Amino acid sequence: MKSVLGFKKAKVTQEKISMVTCYDYTLAKIINSTDIDCILVGDSGGMVLLGKKNTTYTTLDDMQFMTQAVANGATDKFIVADLPFMSYRQSLETTMQAVMALIQSGAHAIKLEGSSGNLDIIKHIVDSGVPVMGHIGMTPQFINSFGGFKVQGRTEEAAKHLLEEAKLLEQAGCFGIVLECIPANIAKDITQNLDIPTIGIGAGSNTDGQILVLQDMLGMNTDFQPKFVKKYIDGSKLFSDAINTYVKETKANTFPTKEHCYDYC
């Protein structure tokens, strides 16, 4: 998938869209060789890569650094980058400066969270030639308002509000919407009522696509294991075992061997 046109086509043909997050050059190069449709340079990188408490601490400088790294490695993939916390709630001028910074860092589109107060901003960004992905449900930048990472849309009123939000984001010009941590039946209803694709994370199997944090699906993060994550490998064990093997071989002087040494000429 090389552009937003791929998202539109996938919605029409009902081909599921696969997305993962990425924050660095090395993993981006690996992803570039896979069949993944799209990469999200998420503000979650502030937590996953930099160890910050939550995404409200991720800065625009962080996002530029990570976006540049991913763009350098994943040269054949469509890249969406998150607008970080408050970068699009101060003024239109600062919003557009942030958008420009991420696009010039290598992103092809940007993502922002929520609908309230964002609709005119989204329209302006889209009218400026930059594709926008929406994000509703459990929006991590609102963690202080939610009182933590909590499933959203569990009441009839909340579910109705989510559908209204999704429709407003579509009308504002979003080419797709992330649905995070909402009941599967609500995500299905939203998906069926939109002409743009939905990308689920903790939203069941009836969305138009799925996204996971790469380090979560590779089993690299042992401290964070939410219900919606499937570990495809135990990366933490694989890496720690490899490092421990290196340590043992170093101490036993079995590494390096002749094949790892240079000959004198």
UniProtKB/Swiss-Prot annotation:
Cofactor notes: Binds 1 Mg(2+) ion per subunit.
GO MF, any single term: magnesium ion binding
Pathway(s) this gene product operates in, as recorded in its UniProt entry: Cofactor biosynthesis; (R)-pantothenate biosynthesis; (R)-pantoate from 3-methyl-2-oxobutanoate: step 1/2
Localization: Cytoplasm
BP GO terms, sorted: pantothenate biosynthetic process
Chief site of localization: cytoplasm
The keyword Magnesium is assigned to this record: yes
Catalytic activity: 3-methyl-2-oxobutanoate + (6R)-5,10-methylene-5,6,7,8-tetrahydrofolate + H2O = 2-dehydropantoate + (6S)-5,6,7,8-tetrahydrofolate
Positions contributing to Mg(2+) binding: D43, D82, E113
Gene3D superfamilies the record matches: Phosphoenolpyruvate-binding domains
Keyword Plastid: no
Subunit record text: Homodecamer; pentamer of dimers.
Protein name: 3-methyl-2-oxobutanoate hydroxymethyltransferase
Gene name per UniProt: panB
